[in-house]
Amino acid sequence: MWDRCSEAAPAGPPPLPPAPAPAATRALSWAPAGGSAPEIIGHLQENYYNLCVEKSQKINYFILHKLQEVDKEIEKGLEGLTLNIAGNSCLMPVERVTGEDFWILSRILKKNLYINGLDVRYNLISDVGAYYAARLLQKQHKLIYLNLMFNDIGPEGGELIAKALHKNTTLKYLRMTGNKIENKGGMFFAAMLQINSSLEKLDLGDCDLEESTVHLGHMLKENHCLVELHMCKHNIKNCGIKQLCDALYLNGSLRYLDVSCNKITRDGMVYLADVLKTNTTLEVLDLSFNRIENAGAKYLSETLASHNRSLKALSVVSNNIEGEGLVALSQSMKINPTLSNVYIWGNKFDEATCVAYSELMQMGRLKPDNTDVEAFVVDGHVYLAEVSNGLKKHYYWRPTYGAACRHSANAGFTLVPVGGHL
């Protein structure tokens, strides 16, 4: 096994494989051919290179290149930096980060005062890397943003990270999206959120959580710090949304709730419409890719017209809503002065729908940047076309050119700007 010096692991960490023999240097664009060491220009890059040599760990030149970029920023006197080692870059060769790579990385970041964000999305750190991510959360008191989405982390890794957050008081934004932590991991996150008092933004989307939704609902009754919660693809049905709604009666902090890509129907909208009559904190609600249909849209419309004056953005994209329900939503916007963003693409438009939303835009009640449709006329008939606006168009990817952070494409983060700069 490797010599881990003073960082002795407690009993029970995920086992590391035997140390590989030092690998030949790859001839990447930032690594000189022939295996010679690259020019060292800063402390992070130098520390990483030296530690890899000391521990006989293969050097990941993608990490080395990214550390070089951060070193340059530090030399300019900048602080509060995010180290971005995303494994889905299209602009350069990528050697994805493994759990063993993350071990070395965590050791050099543990006392760094300049970096407060770490983005390692779309890599392969697995439960081994999750163990070291948990250690980092325990020791690094500057980190406010950690993105671990799609990293093959399982229930054991989810448990380690959740337990590390029991005592962490600095992390504000955590993305666990796409890691299959399952119900076991979800239970530990639910328990953590009853204790943690600093986390403001959490994404547990596509983590294969089902029963845990009930426990997360109970957690919202106790937690008064969380501002944004993403629960996409949880297989939430009407009983699950009822549990969440019961918690929202008592929660006074949540401003952004994302329950897209679930199995919520019109019956679930009865509970949600009721809680929106009294809830005054929720500002963004994402119901995309459910099946609320006309009845569900009408329940929401009645509440928005008569009671709620706090919701600013609503997405009902692809919900099998027909003209009757869509027109009801448009009518509620004429009465409700607060609701500014509505997203409806993927439903069943008739001519009455097209005319209703065209009128909203013509009168200035619905701004072109605040919806995902635009009107056009052919032979005297009004139609709606899709435009690339939404609550989180660039949540899972960013364009490699052009404006990466258009407000109209990511309106949810503009309206509720928790960690929006990260």
Feature annotation, model-predicted:
Residues 1-422:
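Leucine-rich tandem repeat or coiled-coil scaffolds
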